[in-house]
């Protein structure tokens, strides 16, 4: 979407007829990120992390029942040469990841860890990038820090950085 199109969808609450499902993705994402209360919620336990991820994903993907909103993937997924966590290991990996997250103190460190963990696990069939950025920004909002917005023009730089972390471990 162009910015103007997304703004119209948000302002009117009406999807664009030619892109109904995509429009609802915009509305669902906006519903989460526009809520100060929702964006101040951060996980307090590994169970809470799982519930928070599933709740936010359910809202974000509500218009796409074929993508199983709020349900963790049932098949392994990959993007190009990046293969993500096995579908049978998603919950356990998130639980273990929460232990590392819990040890972090600085909000920025927590935000980046949350972004990377969710992106690396890729727990859902679709919407993993958006949900990882929502989780990252929730950490920042909860600490009264500025949100991080990744403009489309920097999309490749952002994805290349994630790929490098995934593949080279640095």
Range-by-range predicted roles:
Residues 1-170:
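FIC/Doc superfamily catalytic core
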């Amino acid at each position: 979407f162009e910015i103007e199109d997304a703004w119209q969808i948000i302002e009117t609450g009406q999807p664009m007829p030619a892109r109904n499902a995509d429009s609802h993705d915009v509305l669902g994402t906006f519903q989460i990120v526009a809520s100060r209360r929702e964006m101040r919620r951060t996980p307090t336990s590994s169970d809470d992390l799982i519930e928070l991820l599933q709740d936010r994903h359910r809202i974000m993907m509500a218009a796409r029942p074929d993508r199983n909103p709020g349900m963790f993937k049932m098949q392994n997924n990959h993007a190009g040469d990046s293969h993500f966590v096995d579908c049978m290991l998603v919950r356990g990996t998130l639980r273990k990841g929460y232990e590392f997250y819990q040890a972090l103190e600085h909000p920025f460190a927590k935000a980046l860890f949350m972004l990377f963990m969710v992106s690396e696990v890729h727990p859902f069939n679709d919407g993993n990038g958006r949900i990882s950025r929502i989780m990252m920004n929730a950490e920042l909002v909860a600490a009264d820090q500025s949100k991080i917005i990744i403009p489309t023009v920097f999309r490749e730089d952002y994805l290349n950085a994630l790929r490098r972390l995934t593949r080279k471990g640095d």
